[in-house]
Amino acid sequence: MILNNNLKLAENAVLSVEESLSKVFQERSNQVFQKLENILTIFKEEKVSTSHFNQSSGSGHDDISREKIDSVFARLFLAEKAAVRMQFVSGTHAISSVLFGILRPGDVMLTLTGQPYDTLEEVIGIRGRGKGSLKDFEIEYKQINICENFDSFEEKIVHSFQENSCRLVFIQKSCGYSWRKSLTNHEIEKICSLIHSLDPNCICLSLIHI
């Protein structure tokens, strides 16, 4: 008898909580439906068909499937371009490919959000022997931390650009292993707008986890 009463109480508690959260669940479902509708619209407008799912040679030449998935991802994440490759084995691998693809000997890379992820330290050359790193290819690395006091970020960036002409600015959205707050998309937009006003040719590379 006691067991049955406890089960009934538990059942009522679950139903009560479920009812109180029904509005939240509905909002989440609506968000999912909206995003799904957006994805299906992109697939339709990009004219994705069964032919794009056929096996390719793997050489990458005239690979319509690869070009199509790049276009779909670029539109989905509101990017100018996208490179979607299963050959990227990690986030560090993907970021390294971007850095080595853009930077050339004599260029300056400026990090605005302090120390980068530890896996990038050896890629840059600020830790380890430096063989094959950006430093090894005579690419100069500098860093500041605008997150310590974001209200004064403009002053710090302007001062850095007065001292150096940067080819690439690296912005890490996530706090990583530090105690700082993660940057919002709006804050990153403000940073990029300021940088492009100082140097339209400077590339802003923002690391965002999706």
Language-model features, listed with the residues they occupy:
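Glycine-rich phosphate-binding segment of PLP-dependent enzymes
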Residues: 15-79
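Local beta-strand N-terminus motif with an aromatic residue
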Residues: 106, 165-166, 201
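Surface-exposed amphipathic alpha-helices with a cationic face
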Residues: 188-199
